[in-house]
């Protein structure tokens, strides 16, 4: 299986697989969009999703999940607030389910122009990094390294120690020997609008895509070559396309047949362009 996309909800999609290397996904946000099918999530749904993901991951497997919440009147008498659901989900998955949370990440994207009275424009979304204990997780961020254009000469650099004192050392490693400028940080920026992403993904018309560069980085960083990537909310097929483009297998599902068809067609078209280039 190079890729397979089925029409099913997340419980069915995740119910028949095991030994997954990476789940890369963005589930519906609570009280945000309905996707024309009355689909919204509450805390119980997120709990069920976490349980299902934990079951399908192999020991040492990783889940990267982009999850935010809109501004609403969530609490009586408090006025409008940014929803706290993402952080409740993170704590629930860590404390109740048992996921390891190595760090916190951020998915940056330009918010819609506007005045935003009383708050700032939202240009990022929480990106949660979960690991299933039991084995060493795959992690290789060299895929995000870029050449600096020159070989750096060793030089004296300083850094602050935990006790507050400043230490000194001579720079070394790939930054010096190969002229590598490392790009991997906690923050990924990516736009999904016209002329900012792959045209086949932009033209899909999905209302809640994430950037293909973000998906490509996550897949190469957290899933070994020929490993299995899963997205139970496949949408336009960004995760699927980036998985097969970068030598990983993919399995995913969506509750709407139109997105299953579009994502499958996008992946098939890319494979055909490789197998039959003329």
What residue spans do the PLM features occupy?
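Core catalytic lobe of class I
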Residues: 1-262, 268
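Conserved phosphoryl-transfer catalytic core
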Residues: 265-278
